[in-house]
């Protein structure tokens, strides 16, 4: 794995600033190695693993070179910080561009709509400007129609005048006929006087029939009253059933229309029957009065008719009873339907409550799973960092052992220069490898942190939805605040622990690299002092960057 394996993720300015710098530094180091002293001797003093011992040794002996790996580490930290800032800036720019693009699209749609409206208005205006040329033809056509109507009116007037003359002639004829009718009326009045005498004789027989008819009419009135009361009761029951259905059953089948239709049909039937009965009784009454003057056989016929009317009345009474039974059956059916719908509504309400409870349970489980997922991510990130640290330790130990074996075999200026060149080349490879190994955990750590932020946002959204669905009480609000504070404290502690682990790993790596370089380097005291100062400054920068990352995580 080379140090430039993540070049697709770096910008051009980043490559120019950070990636090309190690190449120049390594070439300068090689030139320094070429001008070093001719004799090569291995350093037999024990190597310390701390950074303070490295600094004291480099300042006292003056023969150690600056740590390439510490420079690479500072560069990787700066690269990770720049990458984070660049990614945040690019994300903000993309969001801004997306918002602007959406607003531009909306504006284009609005302008298209306005363009269509303006085109329609322009078409209407053009049609209006082209219409005056047709007005003249319309007016001329209307004038011709009016002239024809005037001619028709003149002809109609002449016809009406002729008709008037004919009506005047008819009036004169009717006046003559009226005079003749007056004479015939006088003759009829004489005959009427004679008929009145016969009418007086028939009045006695008529009185008896009238008494009988009065009794029958009283009976008819009584039956009519009973019938009207029963109809009123049926109407009241139907109206009460309709009102109760309209008030209580809003979402039930519309039976009110059916009840109204049934009520209207029976009202029409009852009115028709009453009208038919009245007309029939009136006609029979006139027939009886006329027949009473002639003979008593008509009285018997009247009795038969009365019995027939009674029979008809009984039949109508039976029909009313049947209607009443039908009404009761409909009311019973309506009540059963109401009970059934009430049961369905209660069952649906229970189902809704059950689904709401399941939704709350699912939301709480989802929040719990998200929290567990966040904890697992934190544990995974810590384990990955620890594994990377152990891997770096093992690689550094292997490199140190390989350099020790090579140093024991070198004797003389030629062999020392060859070994020195190989060690420099090996140091270059090791530095490039360690740089890639460091850049990968930093990139992975940033990726994991982004996933952690997304998980936290999802948890907060779920909690916000739960808070909207169920307003929390005071105790729950306090518990939530405590949980938030605890989560923030845990996040801060984890961030501090991660920063400390990273710093410890960096120090261990720097110490190992210093030990390896102490075995390989002897010359260049002034250059080493300057590079040591630069390494110290870069380490301070790394520490400041680690503190900034910790503060950002805390925020």
Swiss-Prot record:
The IF rod domain, residue ranges: 90-401
Residue ranges of the region described as Tail, subdomain A: 398-444
Chain positions found as Phosphothreonine: 532
Phosphoserine: residues bearing it: 56, 67, 103, 473
Bias (Acidic residues): 472-540
Region (Coil 1B): 139-234
Chain spans, region Coil 2A: 254-272
Gene3D superfamilies (UniProt xref): 1.20.5.170, Single helix bin (1.20.5.500), Vasodilator-stimulated phosphoprotein (1.20.5.1160)
Residue spans of biased composition, Basic and acidic residues class: 541-555
Major localization listed first in the record, in broad terms: other
Region (Head): 2-93
Record region (Coil 1A): 94-125
Tail, subdomain B (acidic) as annotated region, ranges: 445-555
UniProtKB keywords: Acetylation, Cell projection, Coiled coil, Cytoplasm, Cytoskeleton, Glycoprotein, Intermediate filament, Methylation, Phosphoprotein, Ubl conjugation
Residue numbers bearing the Phosphotyrosine modification: 43
Highest taxon listed in the record's lineage: Eukaryota
PANTHER family: GLIAL FIBRILLARY ACIDIC PROTEIN, NEUROFILAMENT LIGHT POLYPEPTIDE
Family stated for the protein in its record: Belongs to the intermediate filament family.
Function field: Neurofilaments usually contain three intermediate filament proteins: NEFL, NEFM, and NEFH which are involved in the maintenance of neuronal caliber. May additionally cooperate with the neuronal intermediate filament proteins PRPH and INA to form neuronal filamentous networks.
Note: NF-L is the most abundant of the three neurofilament proteins and, like the other nonepithelial intermediate filament proteins, it can form homomeric 10-nm filaments.
Subunit structure: Forms homodimers (in vitro). Forms heterodimers with NEFH or NEFM; which can further hetero-oligomerize (in vitro). Forms heterodimers with INA (in vitro). Interacts with ARHGEF28. Interacts with TRIM2.
Protein name: Neurofilament light polypeptide
């Amino acid at each position: 794995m080379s140090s430039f394996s993540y070049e697709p993720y770096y910008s051009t300015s980043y490559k120019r600033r950070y990636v090309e710098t190690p190449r120049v530094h390594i070439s300068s180091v090689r030139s320094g190695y070429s001008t070093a002293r001719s004799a090569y001797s291995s350093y037999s003093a024990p190597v310390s693993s701390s950074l303070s011992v490295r600094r004291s040794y480099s300042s006292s002996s003056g023969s150690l070179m600056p740590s390439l790996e510490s420079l690479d580490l500072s560069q990787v930290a700066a690269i990770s910080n720049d990458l984070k800032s660049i990614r945040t800036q690019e994300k903000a720019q993309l969001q801004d561009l997306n918002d602007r693009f959406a607003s531009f699209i909306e504006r284009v749609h609005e302008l298209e709509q306005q363009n269509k409206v303006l085109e329609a208005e322009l078409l209407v205006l053009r049609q209006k400007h082209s219409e005056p040329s047709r007005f003249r033809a319309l007016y001329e056509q209307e004038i011709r129609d009016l002239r024809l109507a005037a001619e028709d009116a003149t002809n109609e007037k002449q016809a009406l005048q002729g008709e008037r003359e004919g009506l005047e002639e008819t009036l004169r004829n009717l006046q003559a006929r009226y005079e003749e009718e007056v004479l015939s009326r006088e003759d009829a009045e004489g005959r009427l006087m004679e008929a009145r005498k016969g009418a007086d004789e028939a009045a006695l027989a008529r009185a008896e029939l009238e008494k009988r008819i009065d009794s029958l009419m009283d009976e008819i009135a009584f039956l009519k009253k009973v019938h009207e009361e029963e109809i009123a009761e049926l109407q009241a029951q139907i109206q009460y059933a309709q009102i109760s259905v309209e008030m209580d059953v809003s979402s039930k089948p519309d039976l009110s229309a059916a009840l109204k239709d049934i009520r209207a049909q029976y009202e029409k039937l009852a009115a028709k029957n009453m009208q038919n009965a009245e007309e029939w009784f009136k006609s029979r009454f006139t027939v009886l009065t006329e027949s009473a003057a002639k003979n008593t056989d008509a009285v018997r016929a009247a009795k038969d008719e009365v019995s027939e009317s009674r029979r008809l009345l009984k039949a109508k009474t039976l029909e009313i009873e049947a209607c009443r039974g039908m009404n009761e059956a409909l009311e019973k059916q309506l009540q059963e339907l109401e009970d059934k719908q009430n049961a369905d509504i209660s069952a649906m309400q229970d189902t809704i409550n059950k689904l709401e409870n399941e939704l709350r349970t699912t939301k709480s489980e989802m929040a719990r799973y998200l929290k567990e997922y966040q904890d697992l991510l934190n544990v995974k990130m810590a384990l990955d960092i620890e594994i990377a640290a152990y891997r770096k330790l093992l690689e550094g130990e292997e490199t140190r052992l390989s350099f020790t074996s090579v140093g024991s075999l070198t004797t003389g200026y030629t062999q020392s220069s060859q070994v020195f060149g190989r060690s420099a080349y090996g140091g270059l490879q090791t530095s490039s490898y360690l740089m890639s190994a460091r850049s990968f955990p930093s990139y992975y750590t940033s990726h994991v942190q982004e996933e952690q932020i997304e998980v936290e946002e999802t948890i907060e959204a779920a909690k916000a939805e739960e808070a909207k669905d169920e307003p929390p009480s005071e105790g729950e609000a306090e518990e939530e605040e405590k949980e938030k504070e605890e989560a923030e404290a845990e996040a801060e502690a984890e961030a501090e622990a991660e920063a400390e682990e990273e710093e410890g790993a960096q120090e261990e790596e720097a110490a190992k690299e210093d030990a390896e370089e102490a075995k390989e380097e002897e010359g260049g005291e002034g250059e080493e002092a300057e590079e040591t100062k630069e390494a110290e400054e870069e380490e301070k920068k790394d520490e400041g960057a680690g503190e900034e990352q910790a503060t950002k995580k805390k925020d």
